[in-house]
C-alpha cells in the first residue's frame, strides 16, 4: 500500500511541467521530497498552511525571519511544485490567499513527525 502511494507520488513529481524539475533525476524518494520542501522557509510555510488559508501578510507575521522577497520566492516554488494554491482576488487593494493542494496536504504526517522530533530534541537539549 505505502509503496504504491510513493510510486504514484513519484510519478506525479516526475511528470511536472517545470523544465528544471523535469531534468532532475532522483535516486531516492527522500531526495525527491527534499527537492520540493528543502527551501529555507518551505517547511514553515507548509506547516502554517495545514488546515488554513492565509494571506501573505499573515504568513509574514508567522515567519518573521523571512524577508518579503524570500517568502515570495518560496511561495512561488511551492506553487510550481503543486503543493499550494495561490488565489488572487480582483479587488483593490490586491488580495492574495494561499492554501495547500491535496499533494501539499499529504505532507501533513511528515511535518507532524518533524514537529514531534523537534520538540523531543529541544526538550533533551534543555531548551
Predicted regions and their residues:
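Short, basic amphipathic alpha-helical segments that act as recognition/interaction helices
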Residues: 55, 119-122, 126-127
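Residues within the DNA-recognition helix of helix-turn-helix
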Residues: 74
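Basic, amphipathic "hinge/linker" alpha-helix immediately C-terminal to the N-terminal HTH DNA-binding motif
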Residues: 90-114
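Short, intrinsically disordered or compositionally biased N-terminal tails of bacterial proteins
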Residues: 1-18
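N-terminal helix-turn-helix DNA-binding core of bacterial DNA-binding proteins
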Residues: 21-70, 90, 97
Amino acid at each position: 500500500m505505502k509503496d504504491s502511494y510513493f510510486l504514484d507520488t513519484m510519478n506525479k513529481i516526475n511528470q511536472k511541467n517545470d523544465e528544471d524539475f523535469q531534468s532532475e533525476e532522483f535516486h531516492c524518494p527522500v531526495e525527491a521530497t527534499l527537492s520540493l520542501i528543502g527551501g529555507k522557509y518551505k517547511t514553515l510555510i507548509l506547516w502554517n498552511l495545514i488546515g488554513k488559508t492565509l494571506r501573505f501578510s499573515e504568513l509574514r507575521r508567522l515567519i518573521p525571519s523571512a524577508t518579503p522577497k524570500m517568502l515570495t520566492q518560496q511561495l512561488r516554488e511551492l506553487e510550481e511544485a503543486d503543493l499550494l494554491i495561490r488565489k488572487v482576488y480582483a479587488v483593490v487593494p490586491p488580495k492574495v490567499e494561499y492554501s495547500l493542494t491535496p499533494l501539499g496536504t499529504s505532507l501533513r504526517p511528515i511535518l507532524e513527525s518533524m514537529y514531534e522530533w523537534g520538540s523531543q530534541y529541544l526538550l533533551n537539549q534543555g531548551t
